[in-house]
Amino acid sequence: MAGRLGRGMWWGKRGRGCRGEGTLLALGLLAALGFLVWRHGPPPLRAARRAPPQPPSPDSELLRRPVYAKPALDPGALGELGRAVRLELSPAEKRRQEESIRRHQINIYLSDRISLHRRLPERWHPLCREKKYDYYSLPKTSVVIAFYNEAWSTLLRTVHSVLETSPDILLEEIILVDDYSDKEHLKETLENYVAGLRKVRLIRANKREGLVRARLLGASVAKGDILTFLDCHCECHEGWLEPLLARIAEEETAVVCPVIDVIDWNTFEYLGNAGEPQIGGFDWRLVFTWHSTPEREQKRRKSKTDSIRSPTMAGGLFSVSKKYFDYLGSYDTGMEVWGGENLEFSFRIWQCGGSLEIHPCSHVGHVFPKQAPYSRAKALANSVRAAEVWMDEYKQLYYHRNPHARLEPYGDVTERRLLREKLKCKDFKWFLENVYPELHVPEDRPGFFGMLKNRGMENFCFDYNPTNEHQVTGQRVTLYPCHGMGQNQLSFV
């Protein structure tokens, strides 16, 4: 289903029309209504939003107004304009700070002292400020934020950031999905707080669902034409929403991600930059990776403000047409908690006729925790599901690098395979050749890969375990007891 889907594929069958005199009467009423609208001015806002694009009007500044205005700038406030904060603490205060980091893997002690409404430095390309939008023609979005035992300040800073940077005319609602939290501050206290905010509603899961199903719970009650998923510790840059919605208005099968800027977990410094965004990729262990934009994609784009095609997404932040999300089969509900769902959805988007893009004019800051605060034990099974459904014979390259994955229970994928057949999706070879030609496909011939065993020391193998996950090359190879799991003991010659 390459290109734009026909409207007949999106909406159900039309009801039968009236006949005879009823038809004439209906036509007459419609004509009269059209005359009244022509005589008495433009139609209501919702109808006008479905009209063809119009030239920017003088009231565009009015249309850009967010749901809430930010408080006046306080240049001396902690963390204002994304500045790093380092507190001088007493021993007792330092212990409380360390406890907050241990519990959340984020410096919540500091976060609680930074305004929920802080302003961010400008981090987009200068040309992005010049872009004009026809706000009446853009669709509305529901922003879905799932959380589990999230700290108060990071969760509420996310909510206020959306409310204070999103045009009122474009934000249908924020849906907070509580994935069965047990912290007291997320119960009645949160309910009372949210009750005082426009366009924010809180729904609760009846049991622990995990990120995938919690997001689907939010999507199931969303009223907006577009679903925008955000993590629960984000801050939105000025003008972040319009580019996402405008691109989907142009192409309904585009799934669009913002540029993800890093917010330091310890100092809350906003580390985004206005340079060329990186795109998502993966390696044959099915680990998500970042890469520079390839030359072929740079040549395809006509402007620095055009969206960038990306083979994969990080997964936490993106916008998608609600109808197209449903058409694609939404999330794989057989996946647990989080991990691997981003690659599975990325493969499905591309192989089933859509496109996955990153928009350089949309920036959202994200606090990357010191380490994952909750277990990712189910991530392996999620990756196996992705490999089994979408990777065809190339799944063997994954299994060679993760031998233990062959033994991992991954549930029933019959429905997902039937979905692939129903949507007439392309094979993984097409994906590699057309979407991600930069990814090297190894031969993996027998005898050319495996573990290198030391013959002088019984049961010891070459082991490569970088101490810094962001710098995986140029580090020392050591000897370590052979574990038979591949991964950091897998060698190729």
Regions found by a protein language model. Name each.
Residues 212, 287-319, 327:
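A recurrent flexible, glycine/aromatic-enriched loop bordering the glycosyltransferase active site
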Residues 434-493:
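Lectin-like carbohydrate-binding module/patch detector with strong preference for beta-trefoil
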Residues 163-204:
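Acidic donor-binding segment of Leloir-type glycosyltransferases
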Residues 235, 239-291, 355:
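Conserved donor NDP-sugar-binding/catalytic core segment of glycosyltransferases
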Residues 139-144, 173, 344:
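Cell-envelope/extracellular polymer assembly enzymes that use nucleotide-activated donors
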Residues 227:
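Short aromatic/hydrophobic "clamp" motif used to bind/position activated sugar donors
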Residues 2-56:
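N-terminal signal-anchor transmembrane helix specifying type II single-pass membrane topology
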Residues 188, 205-222:
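Glycine-rich, basic loop-to-helix element that forms the pyrophosphate-binding segment
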